[in-house]
Amino acid sequence: APYMVAKRGAQEKDKEFLASTDTWFRPAGLSVGPDGHLYVIDMYRQHIETPLSIPADLQTDMDFDAGNTMGRIYRIVPQSSTGVKWEKPNLKDATTEQLVNTLSHKNKWWRTTAQRLLLERQDKTVIPQVKQLFAQSNDPRTRLHALYVLEGMDALDATIVKAALKDPAAGVRENAAILAERFPACLNDLQRLTEDSSLRVSYQATLSLGEFKDKNIIPWLAKTLQAHGQSKWFRAAVLSSELGSSVDLLDALTKSGFADKAEDWKKDLYKELAETIGARNQKSQLKDLLQRA
């Protein structure tokens, strides 16, 4: 599927990862810290409903601010932890070059913090170093951080994006498809990415392709529907663009023999396409659609 599916772990089928008998416990966020452990943000309130959702006669006994000074952060450490000392972060005093090197850190917190600080500083003297990091790093996560640092410093170009579109890591290709939307020179590579072996990459490439106004994308959108049209998500991805919800797309499908074999999902597509064209309410498109009905 082109989307994430959350599932309980095998050891958590009959228990919660984190629970409390305290009815004020309101876990609101989860993150990885600089030490690699999990940190849970507990907003800790007696009530989380707003007064607007509570009948007026019940509000008289309710203090909606109760607990607003009692929020806390929990640090969750595995029982197997050996208590190994960890490096206390001080990235605010790091040189820009050191921040670039930190994009290769094994811990997500260090990498994302280094990326944020690089973008805040906007020291463009390190752009060559970041480009080299993207080209030479063996870690796809580091290559991805480098890409977005370049994007945030307005140093991204079509050559780099084309390389990212062909990256061996699916996650890098998926993000490269988003970045390719700004570069017409990447259109051909982006079109080919709609046939990627990774459904998530193919899905994002389909969405990104719709940002272009070039009618040459229509045959590729039609091919995507032929391959993945059974999925409502792929149909929505195609229909989300102007050209992907046009009579020209309908003509391309007809020409390819799309309607030769009747299938329920194809009926759904025709209905969704007609509804989208109708909602857009462009007279020329409506006229052309009715002529083909």
Pin down the residues of each PLM region:
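Beta-propeller domains with acidic blade repeats across secreted/periplasmic ectodomains
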Residues: 1-98, 109, 113, 117-120
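Long, ordered, helix-rich scaffold segments
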Residues: 63-68, 77-293
